[in-house]
Amino acid sequence: MSDFWEKNKGSITSGLKKTGKVGLSGTKYVAKTGYQAGKKNWGGNKKDKQNKKQGEEDVDDELDEEPAHHASYPPRVVDPSYFPPPPSRTNPSQNVAGEHMPRQTYPAQPSIQQPVYQQPVYQQSAYPAQVPQQAPQPAPQQAQYVIQQPPPPPRNPGYQQLPSQQAYEEPAQYSYQQPPPQSGFQQPPQAGYQPTQQTYQPTQQTYQPTQQTYQRPAQPVPPPPSNQSPQQVIQQPPPPPRSGYQQSPPPQVGYQQPPPPPRAGYQQSPPPQFDYQQPPVQQHAHSGPLPPSRPSDQYLTPIQTQSTVHSQTRPYDLTAPHVKQRLEMQSVDLTNLPPPPTHRDRSSPPKSRESSPAGQSQKVHSGSTPPPTYESSQKDIESSMSSSSVTPSTQPALASRPSSISSQSRSNVPPPMPPKPNEPGMVDVSSFPPPPRPRPTPSMERETALKAQDPSTGPTPRGRLAGSKPPPPPVKPKPRNLAAGSGSGSGSLGSGNHTPLASVDSISQELSKVQLKKTNSKYTQEPTSSKLPPPAVPRKNFTPDKQGTPLPPNKNASLKSPTDQQDVNPFERYLKSAVPAENDRLHKPM
């Protein structure tokens, strides 16, 4: 090894140096590129984070600024007391009753407004053209409007701020297109006429679509100029100040109401209320120096006079504590209650148990009856058998007998146990009808006839059928002169009157023979040799010992000799007869 190191020392060191230099340069390059890439990524992420933060801040600023710009928009939560009452389904006459009042003030307007409504409602050119036409007629009434409408400003002085003007002027310009009349606000006399004209026209136009679409329900809407209209105009502006800044959206609400005609006519009143709120706002900006102030009570009273239903309704207060109804249990005096029933009889109180025995027996009879005893049941069975087999006249007595038997057994038997709650009670057998009569058969009729002739015969034993044949006649006693023939018979007769059956039979046979011999009957003559019957032909015995043509052997030929039967196994004999051997295929004789 030492020689190898000494020989290759230079080449090894030079190779290691080269590899180290190359590796160092590679690691430097990788480190530089990685550092640059990480730096770029970190910078990009930092910029993205900054942009996101700036965007979020901008959004927050916009959200913060939106309430200032849109401060005049109303809140979405509105007091429900300002809405008109809904139509009643149960009493539709109330919906029609309110329509008859404004009809008297309407006839003057449709003649003026009908040609105006023929034009599209949303045309911009229709509004300025209508201003000069309608200005002269409602001028005196509009003057009243101007005089009566300024009071709201002192109540909410915050409406005179600039954002409220800008927020209100923009919707007025876009929705109603009234820039030229607004320029006339510089003149105080025209300021009274023009805003009222501008506000009056949209209200009239909101009336007309309701007239044509709803025709009748549109009439409950506040009427156009009349002696009562100024009062209604005064009544309607106050609600918006109570509920908040609600003056800017009226133009939008006025145009959104006509599309839903299918709803009830009571939903038409809100748009005119919002439309009447326009003149106070326009006059707040220009008629700021007018400070005629009225107490707040004067604004509340017209609202109450407008409709009594609004004053009676109260908004639901979520913070109010819930009224809980407490159920009071009635106290019962336990001393006045009767004692509980005993375990033996749950259906009756214990007082009834102390009553007389007659009442108790009646109660037991009406309820469940105890099972009869064995003796009474046997008597009942025998009586039923005898009564059913004798005559039908005994049937009524049979029906009355179980009741007497049951009454006798009840007097000795203790009161019955009550039935279990899950099992039905026992049924009184005496309440059942009597069993049906059995159909008379020939055997029963014959038996009844025999019993009628001989009443001494008892009833048929239980479990036996009445025989169809009458009983045999009694055997006559044997005469004493014939007793010498048989010693046994004389001994038996001498010993007593009762003779055994064998001797009686033999005596009867002898008597019959003697009587037949006396009459010379042909049945008693002994056969002679000439009249003997021919002998019986013996049966041929087919055995193989006989000479002649052998007959085919029988299957049971092996069973003929008794010796073979004892020696041969029966199973082997069965095999020989059932399954022949090889040399006995054709049943040849052995």
Swiss-Prot record:
Disordered: annotated span: 1-571
Subcellular localization(s) per the UniProt record: Membrane raft
Ranges of biased composition (kind: Basic and acidic residues): 45-56, 342-354
Organism encoding this protein: Zygosaccharomyces rouxii (strain ATCC 2623 / CBS 732 / NBRC 1130 / NCYC 568 / NRRL Y-229)
Biased composition (Polar residues): 275-285, 295-314, 358-368, 497-514, 521-531, 555-568
Biased composition (Low complexity): 108-148, 157-218, 383-393, 400-411
Biased composition (Pro residues): 236-273, 413-422, 432-441
Membrane topology, from the record: Peripheral membrane protein
InterPro entries xrefs: Aim3
GO biological process, one term: barbed-end actin filament capping
Name of the protein: Altered inheritance of mitochondria protein 3
Record's keyword terms, sorted: Membrane, Phosphoprotein
Similarity annotation: Belongs to the AIM3 family.
GO cellular component: actin cortical patch; membrane raft
